């Protein structure tokens, strides 16, 4: 979520200047997603396949149900459609391959390769220690784009650096961006942590755009968020 859409927050500076610049200069909009606070895989499934989660069971994750069935050899997706016209198709994600059974799901959705955390040189983690930072994804995304010669590529890159949980204690000693306005100290600490993590993601976006531009190949970058954070937002 854009922190400026949270009407009670005040921030020392804009945490996502790259995003706001893109928002002002390129096509943007709101994406309706099927989950809140968790369930990234179901947003992915809807975006990649065009199938609505309302036709599945309550609490179901197709990655872990239909896509694991032996009688479901494949599911049509953006990846399979682009593959059919000659694209190389790749996934890059700085989390474990087996989370949400992505290692199985992506192959059935038409992706040629899946570079997960296990195949990366991870050297930096978020202040909570829970997740790798997203900066590693810049080089890994470019590597996926460079992996094929004389071929267009579709690369689906999934970030994890701004993922929850968001600690109620203050664990960033000197935050780049300070936050005030939440109902209590614990909530304020959570929001300050979240804001600084999406600031890091914004830096990743800027660095990715620079890296892609340096390649000198016509490229379209599309970004979307998976769900709102678990922060007690009601409207």
Language-model region placement:
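Solvent-exposed soluble domains appended to multi-pass membrane proteins
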Residues: 1-235
């Amino acid at each position: 979520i854009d922190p400026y859409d949270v009407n009670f927050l005040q921030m020392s500076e804009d945490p996502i200047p790259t995003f706001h610049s893109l928002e002002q200069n390129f096509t943007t909009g709101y994406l309706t997603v099927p989950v809140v606070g968790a369930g990234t895989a179901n947003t992915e499934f809807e975006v990649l396949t065009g199938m609505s989660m309302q036709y599945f069971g309550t609490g179901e994750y197709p990655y872990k149900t239909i896509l694991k069935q032996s009688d479901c050899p494949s599911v049509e997706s953006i990846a399979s459609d682009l593959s059919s016209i000659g694209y190389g198709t790749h996934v890059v994600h700085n989390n474990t391959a087996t989370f949400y059974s992505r290692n199985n799901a992506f192959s059935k959705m038409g992706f040629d390769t899946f570079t997960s955390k296990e195949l990366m040189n991870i050297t930096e983690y978020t202040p909570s220690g829970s997740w790798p930072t997203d900066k590693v994804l810049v080089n890994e995304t470019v590597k996926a784009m460079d992996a094929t010669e004389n071929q267009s590529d579709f690369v689906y890159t999934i970030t994890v650096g701004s993922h929850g949980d968001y600690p109620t204690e203050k664990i960033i000693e000197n935050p780049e961006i300070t936050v005030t306005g939440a109902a209590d100290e614990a909530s304020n600490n959570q929001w300050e942590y979240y804001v600084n993590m999406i600031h890091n993601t914004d830096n990743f976006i800027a660095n990715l755009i620079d890296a892609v531009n340096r390649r000198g190949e016509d490229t379209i970058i599309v970004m979307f968020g998976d769900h709102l954070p678990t922060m007690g937002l009601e409207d």
